[in-house]
Amino acid sequence: MRVLHVTSEVFPFSRSGGLGDVLGALPAVQATLGAQVSVLSPWYGSLAGAPEQIWAGDVADVGPVRVGELRQDGVRFLFLGLPEFEREGLYHPDDVWRFCTYGRAVLPVLRALNEVPDVLHGHDWQAGLVVAHAHEAGWRTVYTVHNLQYQGRWNLAEASGWSGLGPAWLTHEGAEFYGDLNLMKAGLIAANHVTTVSPQYAREITTQQYGEGLQGVLLRLTLEGRLSGIINGLDQERWNPRTDPDVPAYSDLAGKAAATQALRTEFGLDKAPVLGVVSRLADQKGMDLLIEALPRLVHNWNVVVLGGGDPLLTAALEGWAQHPRVSFAQGMNEALAHQIYAGSDAFAMPSRFEPCGLSQMIAMRYGTLPVVRETGGLVDTVPPDVGFRFQPATPEALVEACQQARAAFEDQSDWEARVARAMALDFSWDGPAREYLALYERVVTG
């Protein structure tokens, strides 16, 4: 089985979030299971790594293109070099135009390299146009929605010329969406099968509450048997309390005490249990709910937050950091993130929606019990006998769940049992990788 993943980012070469993490882990596991796997992403000016150039030429209606290659963990990584991507950073305000250019270039380049896969697997809106052109060429395709909120939209009158799509695609039955070209919609309607990153999120996005305007398309896909959810896995080597160089090594609750003490020392915390947060500061992540809940949380918890994003949420947390039981580190710091996952007793994720979420899985692997809102992948991954779940997206519901966690913390046998169950959960990529390979087989033979 020859599989080609098409993505806008892939760890460790280019990463801004969870998409890059997924593409940095899933392909390698698929390769160990016998698939011949390649990953195609842009050759950014800020790319971490030095690909060997293996092809260069002019592509009709695109211009000069070059292709670089790196091999790692049994996977072939291909990097598509276009002038539009030679600037610093990954994402910019003109990304719809940039990824339209990318989308027009991919198939001609793959043909020039004689790289026609059995299955092309596109990820998120940046690959939507690639999936549409692959469909036009008769290729078999899978398309994964990692976050439906980001759809790649631009005024149709302007963007239609960028896409290279024929007139039928530029209608309401095609990729038109309220006067815009919608690249995610193009991928959804073109793919042989669509997945998203948890079974619960696959159900949620067919509703008006979570469908971001595309619920009609997604409901039709569900009724046709073309939409399903496959939970993301976790990089077991990168996130392993037994071997993590950033924390004292441990494999059980007794060993975890050293990591907790190290975190207390780092932030000058008192003896109250520690509620950790590692998150983008955004309303989607429920960080406004956390801030509103802080006046009550500090009665029972030390709260340690690592994250960056919304300026208003950042300013609010900076103000709260004057409180002796609230600590805030702005930005993203990989080593500190590991220390918070390991050293916290509980971990808060009050997300309004969460397609899959990795943080709750990391926390449980480190024996830190999640307090989560019942949405998306948080429902699929946090068992009620391990973590603490709440439904309404309100500060009051978050506080109540944290009170339940504190009560469990005071019951030593209950807490120890929950931690043991958390650390025994299997969040490896092996299961999801096998599910994707089985899906590819169905797509190819169907």
Curated annotation (Swiss-Prot):
GO process terms (BP): glycogen biosynthetic process
Catalysed reactions, semicolon-separated: [(1->4)-alpha-D-glucosyl](n) + ADP-alpha-D-glucose = [(1->4)-alpha-D-glucosyl](n+1) + ADP + H(+)
Class of the enzyme per the UniProt entry, highest EC level: transferase
Pfam families membership: Glyco_trans_1_4, Glyco_transf_5
EC number: 2.4.1.21
Molecular functions (GO terms): alpha-1,4-glucan glucosyltransferase (ADP-glucose donor) activity; alpha-1,4-glucan glucosyltransferase (UDP-glucose donor) activity
Bridged cysteine pairs (disulfide): none
Annotated metabolic or biological route of this protein: Glycan biosynthesis; glycogen biosynthesis
Residues given in the record as ADP-alpha-D-glucose binding sites: R15
SUPFAM superfamilies documented for this protein: UDP-Glycosyltransferase/glycogen phosphorylase
Signal peptide: none
InterPro entries in alphabetical order: GS/SS (IPR011835), Starch_synth_cat_dom (IPR013534)
Top-level taxon of the source organism: Bacteria
Keywords: Glycogen biosynthesis, Glycosyltransferase, Transferase
UniProt xrefs under NCBIfam families: glgA (TIGR02095)
Function: Synthesizes alpha-1,4-glucan chains using ADP-glucose.
Record-stated family: Belongs to the glycosyltransferase 1 family. Bacterial/plant glycogen synthase subfamily.
Identification of the protein by name: Glycogen synthase
Gene: glgA
